[in-house]
Swiss-Prot record:
Keywords: DNA-binding, Transcription, Transcription regulation. SMART domains: HTH_MERR (SM00422). Residues 4-73 form the HTH merR-type domain. This is Uncharacterized HTH-type transcriptional regulator slr0701. CDD domains: HTH_HMRTR (cd04770). It holds the Pfam family MerR_1. PROSITE patterns: HTH_MERR_2. Transmembrane segments: none annotated. GO terms for biological process: positive regulation of DNA-templated transcription.
Length: 137
C-alpha cells in the first residue's frame, strides 16, 4: 500500500509552508492531489517526489514557470537529455550574468565605503552624511 500524507505532513517533511502546496496546485505547477473520505488532500510518494523536485529546482534558481515546463515535458514523456542540457546551460548563463552584476554592485559599494572611511578619518564622524546622495546621483 502506498503512503498517504496530509498537507501538514508533506510540508513538514519537505520543509515547506502548507500554503506553498496550495499555491503550486492553484497555479498548475502540480496536479490536484487525491482527497480522502473527509475531503482532505492526501499525497502519495509520486506527489512527494514531484514536490521534492520542485523544491530542489527552486534552490537551483529555476522559476516556477521553468519548473512547470520541465514537469509538463516529463509528463508527456518528451523531456530529452538535449532539452535538459539546453535548460541547464541557459540557467548557468543567467547565473553568471547575475554574478557579474553583483560583483559590479559590490565594487561600487566598496568605492563608496572607501570614501566613507576617508571622511571618518578626516573627522567626519558626526553630522549629516550625504555621501550616499553624492555617489548615487
Amino acid at each position: 500500500m502506498s503512503i498517504m500524507l496530509t498537507v501538514s505532513e508533506v510540508a513538514r517533511k519537505l520543509g515547506l509552508n502548507p500554503q506553498t502546496l496550495y499555491f503550486y496546485e492553484r497555479i498548475g505547477v502540480v496536479d490536484h492531489p487525491q482527497r480522502n473520505q473527509s475531503g482532505y488532500r492526501v499525497y502519495q510518494e509520486k506527489d512527494l517526489a514531484i514536490l521534492s523536485f520542485i523544491r530542489h529546482a527552486k534552490d537551483l534558481g529555476f522559476s516556477l514557470e521553468e519548473i512547470a515546463d520541465i514537469l509538463h515535458l516529463q509528463s508527456q514523456q518528451s523531456l530529452t537529455c538535449d532539452e535538459i542540457y539546453h535548460k541547464l546551460t541557459s540557467k548557468i548563463l543567467q547565473l553568471e550574468s547575475g554574478i557579474k552584476e553583483m560583483e559590479k554592485m559590490k565594487d561600487d559599494l566598496s568605492k563608496i565605503l572607501s570614501l566613507c572611511c576617508q571622511r571618518i578619518s578626516n573627522g567626519g564622524k558626526h553630522g549629516n552624511c550625504c555621501l550616499l546622495n553624492e555617489q548615487l546621483t
